[in-house]
């Protein structure tokens, strides 16, 4: 056992941690504080001098770059963050015990005791695992963007405008990401080591042999961040992917993941704010767009409140405040929050585009097509994430204008729709799902006498689960229903064409959603069922069938008809393949299935309890 004060003093019971570790953590907390007050460059400048020597400085520096990449989804930002995170990982490796936690704790022979790790070594383990986890997260950025994120003025080059690297650079990036994604699914060694290390560290924290050191809150916060992130992410994956991962040793428990992140968020540690951000992303994006729309909004507000009080002008927290108002259906309040977010900082200028994307949808919910068009136009001119998507949205909004409305800039929706396919970003043979959807919908405009899409803006609103937003406000729902009903009447009066059945079924789906939220349950069910009845007549929009089954199942679940709902969900999952936005639909089916099964189990337990009494 080492002597107190010696550099090899044992952790956690054998001696005093090195003061440099405590000092480094304090400095990194200061840097995060600068970051959260929109002083992005200052935070990086504060950290940079020690990034080559301190693993926490290096990790924090790389984490801020990764946050930038997550906000911008720009390939250059992703590469920059990835390279810096790799350097941080190498630095952590130098501070790790020669026999790592994963190797040591997993070995059945000559297993070292806990006391053989110094505090620096045990912190190096959690930092190393975090580097691996964050590098894995970067692999998801290109394909999972929510559509509003773009490249801001780069931290390292304030004059940099929105630009994307040339083709080869994009291809190399995508290939790198694709390989990392495959390695993640197949149990690639880096992600697997991160997962295993977090599992062992979690066991360590709960062990009766474990003694808390001076910097224990920061260490424990790191463990909770990693364990929570892994469990929560894995638990959300569709069953077919989850089975592959379980086969190679991964598993995820949603409740345990949420608990770990909530405990991490409530502590006072270097990782507390990261736990908060992950939870806010989960509550305001993942469960909303990829789930059933049932969001624990009270928990999101509880998480956000102390940070919004502490950082009233913090752009990140103002953005989440806007998202919460959107989900609550308070559209005017959401608009004010997003506008306030744009005013709060100018350094990451194009971070505003995240707000523009949200503002575009806010005005869509209100049926204010000119304002929606305005933000789609801004995005199409300033944003390099997906020109095809933004031009499609411009065309979609123009097509919603009335005959008497003046169309700005002399734009014509037919020409805009025709331009969409040429703007596709094809990277290593792959396209963004939203772009694929927009391109498929635009194809009908290539004929000399094109047949217009009935309500393209309202269709895309469904793709982003916007009906769960307007459903909170009957007035908004009535307004959208009126537009859909008029479109339905026009289809009935118009001549039959090759798109007639597809368009009629689309209108039925959207109408059913409005009726559901207005409490007209029977009418909603009839509309959803009519789509399945026309399944064999649909020529192009095959995504309508599984989504109609999904929406019908959700409607039945609200009536406690969970067994019927589960059968419909199983049919939607098993019987339909290769349709638009399939992965997103599968995520929603998975969330609905888990919810229905949970309700059935709770009902069974209640019956047993009643009988026992």
From Swiss-Prot:
Instruction: Show the SUPFAM superfamilies listed in the entry.
Output: HCP-like
What InterPro entries does the database record attribute to this sequence?
Answer: Iml2/TPR_39 (IPR019412), TPR-like_helical_dom_sf (IPR011990), TPR_rpt (IPR019734)
Listed under GO cellular component are:
centrosome
Report each TPR repeat as a residue range. Answer: 315-348, 505-538, 546-579
Q: Name one Pfam family in it.
A: Iml2-TPR_39
Task: Give yes or no: UniProt keyword Repeat.
Answer: yes
Alphabetically ordered keywords of this record: Repeat, TPR repeat
Q: What PANTHER family does this protein map onto?
A: TETRATRICOPEPTIDE REPEAT PROTEIN 39 FAMILY MEMBER (PTHR31859), TETRATRICOPEPTIDE REPEAT PROTEIN 39A (PTHR31859:SF3)
**What family does the Swiss-Prot or TrEMBL record give for this protein?**
Belongs to the TTC39 family.
Name under which the protein is recorded: Tetratricopeptide repeat protein 39A
Q: Give the organism, scientific name.
A: Homo sapiens (Human)
Q: Species lineage, top-down?
A: Eukaryota, Metazoa, Chordata, Craniata, Vertebrata
User: Corresponding gene?
Assistant: TTC39A
